[in-house]
């Protein structure tokens, strides 16, 4: 019988993260510094509503306070910026996120730039991305951080390995490439995008393929070197359900892989909690267990 790839369980890994955070949250609460997460949601997109609700459930699970600011899709840019300003000043809020995407009439970059970098729970403020480039301490983007924790937790070699990252977006691909090339990781990274000629030529020589393109079943089995590790990050909602960037047939070729559901997604949410706790620790003058120099 053909051997199937080992499934990397993101739900289990996320639960381990949550378990470890409860102790840190309790320690902060003991000194009157209970962490708090704020969310700003503009519009009624079903996917965004679900994501935000899940983040608040996660907070309750580990003892983090959470605060919601929800607005209609017609909310003005001024109203959104006002909400950002309020959370910047709210002492109960250790960190917050603006749920993306925003309606077309709102300048996403203007809104994200208005977030206090010391309350940037998503790690997407230009200051924090700049800190990542310079290998300085700062908040890391949630999905790339979760990916590295998944790889380490499943004994996937990083240093010296050949990575192929499919997709160069600001939330996953580009920051992931930066994190993989830090001195603490020292991986060799190839970034491919929609303009790349013969993407498969790059993936077939990679030890680890990370697909973050948002194109259903993009990565085919013949793209993968036997025994490689393959992570599916992007998702596409269809009438048949949620599809990942990786064709399920890859399971017959890869050594380890994540499915569309229960893989990278749970770790992204867990890393948001971890970022909030670290922001609260930093504000309280407690040395965090991790920094961008050494952390996943």
Swiss-Prot record:
Keywords: Amino-acid biosynthesis, Histidine biosynthesis, Hydrolase, Methionine biosynthesis, Multifunctional enzyme, NADP, One-carbon metabolism, Oxidoreductase, Purine biosynthesis
Protein EC: 1.5.1.5, 3.5.4.9
Pfam families, sorted: THF_DHG_CYH (PF00763), THF_DHG_CYH_C (PF02882)
GO terms under cellular component: cytosol
Gene Ontology terms: biological process: L-histidine biosynthetic process; methionine biosynthetic process; purine nucleotide biosynthetic process; tetrahydrofolate interconversion
Catalytic activity: (6R)-5,10-methylene-5,6,7,8-tetrahydrofolate + NADP(+) = (6R)-5,10-methenyltetrahydrofolate + NADPH; (6R)-5,10-methenyltetrahydrofolate + H2O = (6R)-10-formyltetrahydrofolate + H(+)
Origin: domain of life: Bacteria
Gene Ontology MF, one: methenyltetrahydrofolate cyclohydrolase activity
Residues at which NADP(+) binds: 167-169, 235
Pathways involved: One-carbon metabolism; tetrahydrofolate interconversion
InterPro entries per UniProt: Aminoacid_DH-like_N_sf (IPR046346), NAD(P)-bd_dom_sf (IPR036291), THF_DH/CycHdrlase (IPR000672), THF_DH/CycHdrlase_cat_dom (IPR020630), THF_DH/CycHdrlase_NAD-bd_dom (IPR020631)
Assigned protein family: Belongs to the tetrahydrofolate dehydrogenase/cyclohydrolase family.
Quaternary structure and interacting proteins, as annotated: Homodimer.
Listed PANTHER family: C-1-TETRAHYDROFOLATE SYNTHASE, CYTOPLASMIC, C-1-TETRAHYDROFOLATE SYNTHASE, CYTOPLASMIC-RELATED
Function: Catalyzes the oxidation of 5,10-methylenetetrahydrofolate to 5,10-methenyltetrahydrofolate and then the hydrolysis of 5,10-methenyltetrahydrofolate to 10-formyltetrahydrofolate.
Descriptive protein name: Bifunctional protein FolD 1
């Amino acid at each position: 019988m053909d051997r199937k790839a080992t499934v990397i369980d993101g739900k289990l890994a996320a639960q381990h993260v949550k378990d470890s955070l409860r102790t840190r949250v309790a320690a902060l609460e003991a000194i009157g510094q209970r962490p708090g997460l704020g969310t700003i949601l503009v519009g009624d997109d079903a996917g965004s509503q679900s994501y935000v609700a899940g983040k608040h459930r996660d907070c309750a699970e580990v003892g983090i306070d959470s605060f919601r600011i929800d607005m209609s899709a017609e909310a003005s840019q001024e109203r959104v910026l006002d909400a950002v300003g309020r959370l910047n000043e709210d002492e109960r809020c250790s960190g917050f996120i603006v749920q993306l995407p925003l309606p077309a009439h709102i300048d996403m970059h203007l809104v994200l730039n208005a977030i206090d970098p010391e309350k940037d729970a998503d790690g997407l403020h230009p200051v924090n991305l700049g800190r990542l480039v310079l290998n300085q301490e700062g908040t890391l983007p949630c999905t790339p951080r979760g990916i590295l924790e998944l790889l380490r937790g499943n004994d996937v070699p990083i240093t010296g390995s050949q990575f192929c990252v499919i997709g160069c977006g600001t939330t996953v691909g580009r920051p992931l490439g930066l994190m993989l090339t830090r001195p603490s990781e020292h991986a060799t990274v190839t970034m491919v995008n929609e303009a790349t000629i013969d993407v498969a030529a790059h993936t077939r020589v990679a030890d680890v393929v990370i697909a973050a393109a948002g194109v259903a079943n993009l990565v085919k089995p013949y793209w993968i070197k036997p025994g490689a590790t393959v992570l599916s990050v992007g998702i596409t909602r269809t009438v048949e359900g949620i599809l990942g960037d990786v064709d399920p047939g890859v399971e017959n070729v890869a050594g380890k892989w994540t499915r569309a559901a229960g893989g990278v997604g749970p770790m992204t949410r867990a890393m948001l909690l971890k970022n909030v706790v670290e922001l609260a620790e930093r504000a309280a003058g407690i040395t965090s267990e991790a920094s961008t120099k050494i952390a996943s």
